[in-house]
Design a protein with these regions (language model features):
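Accessory helical-bundle/CTD segments and flexible terminal tails appended to RecA-like ATPase motors
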Residues: 109-138, 449-453, 511-516, 527-546, ...
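Conserved RecA-like helicase motor-core motifs
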Residues: 256, 276-287, 455-456, 462, ...
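Conserved helicase motor "Helicase C" RecA-like lobe of SF1/SF2 P-loop NTPases
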Residues: 265-275, 444-456, 503-516
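Long, charge-rich boundary regions
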Residues: 471-559
Length: 736
C-alpha cells in the first residue's frame, strides 16, 4: 500500500499566528497571512484571502515565512468547506513548478481549475411523512398513494413522489400544505456508479494472462514501479491493464487512466463498461462546467474510483490513488505547449513516484525514451507478441510514386486505386490516411506567383473549401476565400497546390461515386458525441471508406476494415524536429494497425517517394527493433535525447529589434562549460506568430547535467521589457 509522505513541512503548528498561502496565479510564491491560531489550518486547506481590493481562494502552503512584518499582514477571511488538496498533490505542484521553471501558482491553477467545485454541493429538497398526521386530514385515493409510499420507504423529492404515485405535483404540495409532509434535505446522489472489480472479464490468452497477473501483483503490493506494456496493434493491451485497475479497486484504491484523445474514447468507454459494469468518471476539455464541478468533487471525496482523462487529469486531488496508466504513451498530445509547459507522460511517472504507486506505460510503438529506460533497467517491460483472437498483422507494401505515378492533379496511385475498388467490391471497408487538414496547404496566383500567407504569422494560409475560407493553422486567423489575387487583382487565377483531406475526398468521390465515405478530422469531429456517432457508423458498416488525419490512428477497432492507404507517407519525415523519423514511424505504424484486426487479412499501402528510407523499410519488414536501434545510435552520436538534455528558450515580441536586443544580451550571458552547448539565438522556424517576432535558443547538455540550475543562473539577472516574453520549454518536443 502507498506510504504516508507527511512531514513537518506539510503541517502548520497549532496556534500559529501566520500561514503562507499559495494563490492560483502566476506569482513567485506563497504570501503570508494572519490567522487567529484557533482555526486549525493544515497544508492543503482552501481559504479565502484578500488580494488587493478583491478576495481570492488560495491554499494553505505551510507556516508563514516571517518575511513580512506583523503590522503589514492581512487576515485570512475564512476557510472553505471543501476537501483539502492531498499532501502528495501539494508536493507534485512544487515538483512540476521547479522542473518546468514555472510559477508555483500557475501550476496550482491546474489543480484548482474548477473554482465552483469548492462550493458545497446543494442538498436536494424532499418530503417525508409527518410523525402524526393531522386529525382533520382529508385522505383521497391519490393522497393515500403518497402516504403509503412514504410510510414504506425513504423521503423523496416531490417530483419523484408524484411520478411513483401516478398523481400530479399539486397533490404532493397540498399534502405538504395540510401538514402531512415534512420538508427534509437529502444529500446529492453519487455522481458515478461504482465499478465492479470482481465482474468477469473477457478470456485472456496466455501472454495476456501472464502480463495481467504481473501488473495486478504490482498494484496489490504497492510501491513505486514503472512497467512498459508493449505489444502489437490489436494485441489486447487494454484488457491487460484493466486487471491492474481491478486490483486497485479490490485494494480500496482509485485508478487514473490517461488517454491522448479522450474525446475519441467511445470504444474504450464501452470496453470499460463491459468489464466493470459501470462507466468511469471522465476529465477533459469537452466537459461542461457543471460536469467538471461534479467530477472534481467526486474525485476529491473518493467517490469516483476510476478516472479516465486527458493530461490535466494528473492534477486532480485523488485521496486514494493506487495506479496510473498512460495509454498510447508515445503520443505527442501528452506534451502541453502553452501555459505551464510539461510532458504528461513524464509527469505521470513523477506523480506515481511521489505517491509511491505503480504506473503502466502502454503503447504498440513505445517512445525511444521509454525503450532506453527499459534497456537501462529503470523500467520493467511486458510484451504481447500476437494479435488477440488469432488475427494476423497486415501486409505492408511501399508504393514507389516515382514508378507508379498518380494521374495528373490526382493523389492516388494506380495500385492504390485498384486496391480501393477491389476492397469495396468484396464488401469490406478501407481507410485513407492523409495528415493534412483542409483542401490544400498552399494557394498561389497563376498570374503573378503570389502565395497567400497569414498576415500574423510566417505561415501559408490553408484553403478550407467546405466553409469557403482560408485559415492559418497556427494562430487561427481566417478570411473568406478571395475571388481575386490580393496582390495583382487577377480574377480566377488562384490555384490550390497539394492535397488536403477535403481535396482527397473530392478525388475519391469522383473515382468511387457509389462508395459511402466519411471524413474524420478535427474540423469534422467537434466533440465526443460526433466522434461516437462516426465510430458507430463505421462499426455498423454504414461507411465504406473512411478518410482522415491522425485522429483515425487512435486505437479504433473496425472488424471489416481490411485496407489502409497512406496517401503521403513522407509527410513529416523531414524538417528540424529531432523526433521526425520516430514520430512518422509511430504514426504510420498505428494507422497501419487499423487493418485486418478480425478474421479478414489486412493490407497497407504506403505511397512514398523514399521507399528506401529506414522508416519505410522498418514498416514494410515489420522490424521495429532495428529501426529503434538505428534511431538510438543516431541520437547518441550527437548527444540528443534521450542521451542528452535539451531546454528551449523562445523570446517573442511585437518589435523585432527589441527581441533581438534581449537575445544578444542573453547570448553574452549564456552558460558554458564541459558538456554544455548553447545553440542560437536564431529566428524560429515559425519566425512570426500572432504578429510577435520569435527568436530561439537551445540549451544542450550532457545527460548527467540538470538544465534547471543553469537556466535559473542564466535567466535570473535578465530584465525583460514589458513587450518581450520569454518562454522556457524543458525537454522540448516542438521546434517551431
Amino acid at each position: 500500500m502507498p506510504v504516508s509522505h507527511a512531514s513537518s513541512a506539510e503541517t502548520v503548528a497549532p496556534g500559529a499566528s501566520r500561514v503562507s498561502v499559495l494563490l492560483p496565479l502566476p506569482l513567485a510564491g506563497p504570501y503570508d497571512y494572519r490567522t487567529d491560531g484557533a482555526t486549525g489550518l493544515t497544508r492543503g486547506d482552501f481559504v479565502i484571502v484578500p488580494l488587493g481590493t478583491r478576495q481570492v481562494v488560495g491554499v494553505v502552503w505551510g507556516e508563514g515565512t516571517g518575511d513580512v512584518v506583523e503590522s503589514k499582514l492581512r487576515d485570512i477571511v475564512a476557510p472553505v468547506d471543501a476537501p483539502p488538496l492531498p499532501p502528495v498533490l501539494c508536493r507534485f505542484v512544487e515538483w512540476v513548478a521547479n522542473y518546468t521553471l514555472s510559477p508555483p501558482g500557475a501550476v496550482l491553477r491546474m489543480a484548482m481549475s474548477v473554482p465552483a467545485a469548492l462550493d458545497p454541493p446543494r442538498p436536494i429538497p424532499a418530503w417525508r411523512l409527518a410523525d402524526d398526521l393531522p386529525a382533520q386530514l382529508r385522505v383521497t385515493p391519490e393522497r393515500q398513494r403518497i402516504i403509503e409510499l412514504l410510510r414504506d420507504g425513504p423521503a423523496r423529492p416531490a417530483s419523484e413522489l408524484a411520478r411513483e404515485a401516478g398523481v400530479g405535483l399539486g397533490v404532493v404540495k397540498a399534502l405538504a400544505a395540510a401538514g402531512a409532509l415534512v420538508a427534509v434535505a437529502l444529500p446529492p446522489p453519487a455522481a458515478f456508479d461504482l465499478p465492479d472489480a470482481d465482474r468477469a472479464g473477457p478470456t485472456l490468452n496466455p501472454p495476456q494472462s501472464t502480463a495481467a497477473m504481473e501488473l495486478a501483483r504490482k498494484v496489490a503490493s504497492g510501491g513505486f514501479t514503472v512497467t512498459a506494456l508493449d505489444g502489437v496493434t490489436g494485441a489486447g493491451k487494454t484488457e491487460v491493464y484493466f486487471e491492474a485497475i481491478a486490483a486497485a479497486l479490490q485494494g480500496g484504491r482509485q485508478a487514473l487512466v490517461l488517454l491522448p484523445e479522450i474525446a475519441l474514447g467511445a470504444q474504450w468507454l464501452d470496453r470499460f463498461a463491459a468489464r466493470f459494469g459501470a462507466r468511469p468518471a471522465q476529465w477533459h476539455s469537452d466537459l461542461t462546467a457543471a460536469e467538471r464541478r461534479v467530477a472534481w468533487r467526486a474525485v476529491a471525496r473518493g467517490e469516483a474510483r476510476v478516472i479516465v482523462g486527458a493530461r490535466s487529469a494528473l492534477f486532480l486531488p485523488y485521496p486514494e490513488l493506487g495506479v496510473i496508466v498512460v495509454d498510447e504513451e508515445h503520443d505527442a498530445a501528452y506534451k502541453q505547449e502553452d501555459g505551464v509547459i510539461y510532458q504528461a507522460r513524464d509527469m505521470a511517472v513523477v506523480r506515481a513516484r511521489l505517491t509511491d504507486i505503480p504506473i503502466v506505460l502502454v503503447s504498440a510503438t513505445p517512445s525511444l525514451e521509454t525503450v532506453q529506460n527499459v534497456a537501462g533497467g529503470r523500467y520493467a517491460a511486458l510484451h504481447l507478441p500476437d494479435r488477440h483472437g488469432g488475427a494476423q498483422l497486415p501486409i505492408v507494401t511501399a508504393v514507389d510514386l516515382r514508378a507508379d505515378r498518380p494521374p495528373r492533379q490526382s493523389w492516388l496511385s494506380p495500385i492504390l486505386r485498384k486496391a480501393l475498388g477491389d476492397t469495396l467490391a468484396a464488401g469490406e471497408q478501407a481507410l485513407l490516411f492523409l495528415n493534412r487538414r483542409g483542401y490544400a496547404p498552399l494557394t498561389l496566383c497563376r498570374a503573378c506567383g503570389h502565395r497567400l500567407q497569414c498576415p500574423r504569422c510566417t505561415a501559408w494560409l490553408v484553403e478550407h473549401r467546405l466553409v469557403g475560407k482560408l485559415q492559418c493553422h497556427h494562430c487561427g486567423f481566417q478570411v473568406p476565400f478571395p475571388g481575386a489575387c490580393p496582390s495583382c487583382k487577377a480574377e480566377g487565377m488562384l490555384a490550390a497546390c497539394g492535397p488536403g483531406v477535403e481535396r482527397l475526398t473530392e478525388e475519391v468521390t469522383a473515382l468511387l461515386p457509389a462508395a459511402r465515405t466519411a471524413v474524420m478530422t478535427s474540423d469534422t469531429i467537434t466533440g465526443p458525441l460526433a466522434a461516437t456517432e462516426l465510430i458507430r457508423r463505421v462499426q455498423d458498416h454504414e461507411v465504406d471508406l473512411l478518410i482522415g488525419t491522425q485522429m483515425i490512428a487512435k486505437g479504433h477497432h473496425f472488424p471489416m476494415l481490411t485496407l489502409v492507404g497512406v496517401v503521403d507517407a513522407d509527410l513529416g519525415l523531414h524538417g528540424g524536429d529531432l523526433r521526425a523519423a520516430e514520430r512518422t514511424y509511430q504514426l504510420l505504424h498505428q494507422v497501419a494497425g487499423r487493418a485486418g484486426r478480425a478474421d479478414r487479412p489486412g493490407r497497407v499501402l504506403l505511397q512514398t517517394y523514399e521507399p528506401k528510407h529506414p522508416v519505410m523499410q522498418a514498416l514494410v519488414a515489420g522490424d521495429r527493433e532495428r529501426f529503434l536501434a538505428s534511431e538510438a545510435d543516431d541520437r547518441q552520436s550527437v548527444g540528443m535525447p534521450p542521451f542528452g538534455r535539451l531546454a528551449a528558450l523562445i523570446l517573442s515580441g511585437p518589435d523585432a529589434d527589441a527581441v533581438d536586443n534581449i537575445a544578444r544580451t542573453l547570448a553574452r550571458a549564456a552558460p558554458h562549460g564541459d558538456g554544455i552547448e548553447i545553440l542560437g539565438p536564431a529566428p524560429a522556424p515559425l519566425a512570426i506568430l500572432r504578429r510577435r517576432h520569435r527568436r530561439r535558443f537551445l540549451l544542450k547538455c550532457r545527460r548527467d547535467i540538470a538544465p534547471q540550475p543553469l537556466l535559473r543562473h542564466w535567466l535570473g539577472p535578465v530584465k525583460l521589457p514589458a513587450s518581450v516574453r520569454l518562454q522556457v520549454d524543458v525537454d522540448p518536443y516542438s521546434f517551431l
